[in-house]
Amino acid sequence: MPELPEVETTLRGLSPHLVGQRIHGVILRRPDLRWPIPEQIERLLPGATITNVRRRAKYLLIDTDAGGSALLHLGMSGSLRVLPGDTLPRAHDHVDISLQNGRVLRFNDPRRFGCLLWQSGTQTHELLAALGPEPLSDAFTGDYLHALAQGRRAAVKTFLMDQAVVVGVGNIYAAESLHRAGISPLREAGKVSLARYRRLADAVKDILAYAIQRGGTTLRDFISPDGAPGYFEQELSVYGREGEACKQCGRVLKHATIGQRATVWCGSCQR
């Protein structure tokens, strides 16, 4: 699933091609994605001008002058590309938003876990209402994590992936951040010290910023809007490396399932 760096990479790739463009039309080839596409998409987008493209957590918002924003989530396997308008659709190309300049914003989603919804300009969509702070913001600190974790018995990895705690940190970057901070993913969230949470917050910020710089992580599904892969996969320390040697100490990495998610860590470097 695309995580924050992949969505940020998508945002940065799309924004120069979209902002200021007038929307010519909308084609819905498959309106039943994770949720049905609301009627406002077909009714309000044609004729509207795109005023901004932004990200909140793993969601993209395409702001318009039509009184609201298109709200997109890439799901497990979705991608957005800006293409010449005469590019023939492929399998799983479910939505086209055609632009005044003759190009088209195309949403492809093989598994259909993504979504295209509408957020009124006067309201915050319910999917965004209860989200935690952005991990690269000043609001996300070790002190914040430590205070919120008090009394929590869930594994610290599960805690870190809770979108009400902090947004955009999924399985890949939670595993990598915990390894850099030297914290076992199995440790109870409420038993991690303030000093270690400060290291963890710093690790999250550093790893996410570097992953964005490297264009995200290309595993099975993600490609950037220009079709290029993300290169952070080459930098992974633990994620997807079960049974291999820890790059830090050389010991064999461990594997377990935490919160129904595969987890790899070093039993020596992470305590």
UniProtKB/Swiss-Prot annotation:
- State the superkingdom: Bacteria
Q: What does this protein do?
A: Involved in base excision repair of DNA damaged by oxidation or by mutagenic agents. Acts as a DNA glycosylase that recognizes and removes damaged bases. Has a preference for oxidized purines, such as 7,8-dihydro-8-oxoguanine (8-oxoG). Has AP (apurinic/apyrimidinic) lyase activity and introduces nicks in the DNA strand. Cleaves the DNA backbone by beta-delta elimination to generate a single-strand break at the site of the removed base with both 3'- and 5'-phosphates.
Question: What cofactor does its activity depend on?
Answer: Zn(2+)
Q: Tell me what this protein is called.
A: Formamidopyrimidine-DNA glycosylase
Instruction: Note the zinc finger regions (FPG-type) by start and end residue.
Output: 237-271
Identify the gene encoding this protein: mutM
| Protein family (similarity comment) | Belongs to the FPG family.
Q: What species was this sequence derived from? A: Xanthomonas euvesicatoria pv. vesicatoria (strain 85-10) (Xanthomonas campestris pv. vesicatoria)
Q: What EC number(s) does this enzyme carry?
A: 3.2.2.23, 4.2.99.18
Catalytic residues, per the record, are: 2-3, 58, 261
InterPro entries recorded for this chain?
A: DNA_glyclase/AP_lyase_DNA-bd, DNA_glyclase_Znf_dom_DNA_BS, Formamido-pyr_DNA_Glyclase, FPG_cat, MutM-like_N-ter, Ribosomal_uS13-like_H2TH, Znf_DNA_glyclase/AP_lyase, Znf_FPG/IleRS
Residues annotated as binding DNA:
92, 111, 152
One BP annotation, GO: base-excision repair
Q: Cross-referenced Gene3D superfamilies, in alphabetical order? A: 1.10.8.50, MutM-like, N-terminal
The alphabetized UniProt keywords are: DNA damage, DNA repair, DNA-binding, Glycosidase, Hydrolase, Lyase, Metal-binding, Multifunctional enzyme, Zinc, Zinc-finger
UniProt catalytic activity: Hydrolysis of DNA containing ring-opened 7-methylguanine residues, releasing 2,6-diamino-4-hydroxy-5-(N-methyl)formamidopyrimidine; 2'-deoxyribonucleotide-(2'-deoxyribose 5'-phosphate)-2'-deoxyribonucleotide-DNA = a 3'-end 2'-deoxyribonucleotide-(2,3-dehydro-2,3-deoxyribose 5'-phosphate)-DNA + a 5'-end 5'-phospho-2'-deoxyribonucleoside-DNA + H(+)
Quaternary structure per UniProt? Monomer.
What does the Swiss-Prot or TrEMBL cofactor note state? Binds 1 zinc ion per subunit.
Q: Which HAMAP family match?
A: Fapy_DNA_glycosyl
Under SMART domains, the record lists: Fapy_DNA_glyco, H2TH
Any one Gene Ontology MF annotation carried by this entry is:
8-oxo-7,8-dihydroguanine DNA N-glycosylase activity
Give a single Pfam family match: Fapy_DNA_glyco
